[in-house]
């Protein structure tokens, strides 16, 4: 049985009030010369595009391996800070299915998709987190910001960007969470997907949330409202009693099984892998429904 990862409050993080470059190096498992080497900023990145299955392409800003390794270690340090109940990615033990399941049974579900979240998260926000929230020295906050950003924003290919996208707006999410708690709403955040649900969710309150986003320099480009009908949250259908895969997921599985029967060689192996992946996703949804049915201890 997997063990639960230990977390600690923010003010008990080894990064909290960090003022020594030597201690930073020890935390990241590198030497001071290696720290200088990975602090060269934009020169350590390569940009390219990869095609999306849905069409179009995704632009990737990929850090060189030594920098990426340091970013991954820093991400683990930040992920060890106890997350709020509403944060679902990147949090160990939480996923897109459990994110959707939080909204089961609510009559109204409202979803906002933040536009270009990583490119629109500026370095000044990242510096603010390291300096004002973690309380690092100004010098180290600047150094950490250099390690974390590319061309003045969070890079799309960095393993550090998902957790920093949350922490860079630590104050914003705190205010949004306080508003939702005061109104009895359910709030979840899954990277750039913000979902609020309840028996009723007023337009006025959603406007207040949007105002918080706009004041922070963020914009949404998709808004979905579901009232007294199944909602789709992070690719999962949310109903009154449980979660389910969308019909397109079942169609993909049907097509993949057909390909297994029809194809040969490497193409068949690829189809088998596709079937296994889709079955795993459906099983994850089934497990989540079993948790929902389990009586609270």
Kindly give the residue locations of the regions a language model identified:
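Right-hand nucleic-acid polymerase module
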Residues: 1-51, 55-112, 117-158, 167-178, ...
